[in-house]
C-alpha cells in the first residue's frame, strides 16, 4: 500500500502534500500537510530498530511530565515491515535572549526530576545504537558499565579502537571516583545537540528525539557544548536556578567521551583523535 494511503487511513484525513524533511539519518522523515493540519511523520524498519518509536514516545512523555515542552504525539502504529510515528509539526521562529532563559528553565525542570537510581526501567536508543539503561546505585558505576564500556566494545569490534586504547580506558576508570560529581540522579534528555531543540512560538523551547535516562545532569550540559548552536549565556541562567557542582567545565571532556564514542561508531575515525586526547590525559 502506498505511504499516502497508509497515513490517510490512520489519520482519517486527506493528504494534500507529503514532503521529505532533512535530518533523517536514521528514520525517513516527512512533513504531512492535510486540509486542516500539518504533521511530522517518521518511518523506520520494524526489524532493524525494534520498538524505536515506542521508546521515543515514552521519552517524550517523560519530558512532558516535567513541564518542559515536546511536540504533541498524534499516533504511533506499525505494519508488517515498518513502524510509524506521527507528531505535531512545529513551525520554528527566530530566537532572542528570552528563548535561552526559557531553555534554561525547561532544562532545570528536567534535571530536578529525580529517581532513586541511575538508569531507567527500560532500554532505548541513542541515534541508531542500543542504549543499556540497567539501573545502578552510583553515577560512576553507571557511566562505566552502561555508557562507556558498551560503546568501547562496539568500537573495538569494528577495529576503530585497539588494545592500547582499552588499556587507557581502564586507567581512566580507576580515577573516575575522584573526578565525577556525586549528585542525585537527574532526568536527562540524553542527546541534547542543537538539532534536537526546536524554537517554538512565543520563544518556547521544544525537545525532540530524546534518549532519556536518569544520569548526571552534566551529560546534557556537555552535549550543548559539543557542536555549538546554543547561546553561551544560557548556562548563566541555568546556574542561577540550579548551580552546577564546582569543576563542571573540567568534567566536560570526561562526559563527552560517550557521545564521541557513539559518533566514532556511527560516523567513523574522525572522532578518534579527540577521544585519544582525553584518555591519554589521565
Q: What is the role of each PLM region?
A:
Residues 2-9, 115-187, 281:
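An alpha-helical support segment within catalytic cores of ATP-dependent transferases
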Residues 132-144, 153, 184-187, 194, ...:
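Active-site Asp-x-Gly
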Residues 19-141:
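ATP-binding pocket architecture of kinase catalytic cores
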Residues 14, 35-39, 204:
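Short acidic/polar mixed-charge low-complexity motifs
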Residues 269-282:
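Short, basic/aromatic-enriched C-terminal tail that caps enzymatic domains
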Residues 12-19:
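Conserved N-terminal boundary motif of the eukaryotic protein kinase catalytic domain
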Residues 67, 111-118, 155, 180, ...:
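A general structural signal marking secondary-structure boundaries and capping sites
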Amino acid at each position: 500500500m502506498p505511504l499516502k494511503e497508509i497515513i490517510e487511513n490512520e489519520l482519517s484525513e486527506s493528504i494534500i502534500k507529503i514532503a521529505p524533511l532533512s535530518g533523517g539519518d536514521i528514520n525517513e522523515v516527512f512533513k504531512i500537510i492535510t486540509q486542516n493540519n500539518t504533521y511530522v511523520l517518521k518511518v523506520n524498519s520494524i526489524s532493524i530498530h525494534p520498538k524505536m518509536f515506542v521508546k521515543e514516545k515514552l521519552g517524550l512523555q517523560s519530558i512532558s511530565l516535567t513541564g518542559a515542552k515536546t511536540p504533541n504525539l498524534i499516533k504511533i502504529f506499525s505494519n508488517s515491515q515498518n513502524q510509524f510515528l506521527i507528531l505535531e509539526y512545529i513551525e520554528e521562529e527566530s530566537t532572542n535572549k528570552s528563548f535561552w532563559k526559557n531553555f534554561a528553565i525547561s532544562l532545570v525542570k528536567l534535571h530536578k526530576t529525580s529517581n532513586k537510581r541511575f538508569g531507567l526501567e527500560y532500554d532505548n536508543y541513542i541515534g541508531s545504537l542500543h542504549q543499556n539503561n540497567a539501573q545502578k546505585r552510583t553515577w560512576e558505576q553507571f557511566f562505566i558499565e552502561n555508557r562507556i564500556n558498551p560503546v568501547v566494545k562496539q568500537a573495538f569490534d569494528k577495529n576503530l579502537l585497539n588494545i592500547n586504547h582499552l588499556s587507557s580506558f581502564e586507567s581512566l576508570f580507576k580515577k573516575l571516583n575522584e573526578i565525577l560529581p556525586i549528585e542525585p540522579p537527574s532526568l536527562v534528555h540524553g542527546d541534547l545537540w542543537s538539532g534536537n531543540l526546536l524554537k517554538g512560538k512565543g520563544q518556547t523551547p521544544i525537545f525532540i528525539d530524546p534518549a532519556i535516562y536518569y544520569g548526571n545532569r552534566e551529560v546534557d550540559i556537555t552535549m550543548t557544548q559539543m557542536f555549538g548552536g546554543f547561546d553561551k549565556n544560557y548556562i548563566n541562567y541555568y546556574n542561577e536556578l540550579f548551580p552546577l557542582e564546582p569543576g563542571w567545565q573540567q568534567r566536560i571532556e570526561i562526559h563527552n567521551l560517550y557521545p564521541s564514542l557513539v559518533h566514532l561508531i556511527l560516523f567513523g575515525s574522525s572522532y578518534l583523535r579527540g577521544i585519544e586526547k582525553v584518555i591519554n590525559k589521565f
